[in-house]
Amino acid sequence: TAAMGPARVSVLLPTYNERDNLPLVVWLLARTFRDSGIDFEIIIIDDGSPDGTQEVAQQLEKIYGSDKILLRPRARKLGLGTAYIHGMKYATGNFIVIMDADLSHHVRLHFVYCGKQKEGNFDIVSGTRYKGNGGVYGWDLKRKLISRGANFLTQVLLRPGASDLTGSFRLYRKEVLQKLMEKCVSKGYVFQMEMIVRARQLGYTIGEVPISFVDRVYGESKLGGNEIVSFLKGLLTLFATT
């Protein structure tokens, strides 16, 4: 039934050069789900990382079992939006979590998300950096401005009703995510935003949880100059088509 909470959660984890982060993310995820008694699987969608991410994923598959860790790689870097679509094909959970492998998201929040979902029987639970105690640590001013600017622009143009659209950490009811993916046209980071905009149009319910977003434990921030340009382009396209 629609009122059912998360019985099994599928985590879609797109990776590109995340060799150092992956074992820690997987360990934290596994521990969090086990502590909260939620059945889970982690689907690793690696886009042909040259750094040995896939070899690490194979080791993790051996350690945790292939029912818990599913490596479903692609030949080359094809972008976030299509990574989630690819991962969905293999997901068996009734709820889906989409997140980055770079530990920007407090993994322990999965438990909170599941609780929040049950509390309001939401279709989607999204983390927000700009509500209550969801502060942003370790972000330089430029990133803060870009992130706030992106959010502000999106809110002005599209009024989507979720205060942090770019925070790519969400829990979706599986059939809701499938429906949204059919409707989404964007690639890359814009994809995350479009999902929420479309969700609102289709009348799905969104619960929000404040996230204290600790900027990437290892590795450089992934939002490069050309990402930002394509983000803005995507935003305009989205504005034109909604």
Regions found by a protein language model. Name each.
Residues 1-31, 37-38:
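N-proximal low-complexity "stem/linker" segments adjacent to membrane-targeting elements
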Residues 72-90, 95, 107-189, 216-226, ...:
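Acceptor/aglycone-binding surface of glycosyltransferases and processive sugar-polymer synthases
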Residues 12-15, 45-47, 74:
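Conserved sequence signature across two-component system core domains
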Residues 20-24, 51-60:
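Acidic helix N-cap motif at the loop->helix transition within catalytic regions
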Residues 40-43, 54-90:
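Conserved donor nucleotide-binding strand/loop of the catalytic core
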Residues 160-161, 186-187, 196-214:
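Catalytic donor-sugar/metal-binding loop of nucleotide-sugar-dependent glycosyltransferases
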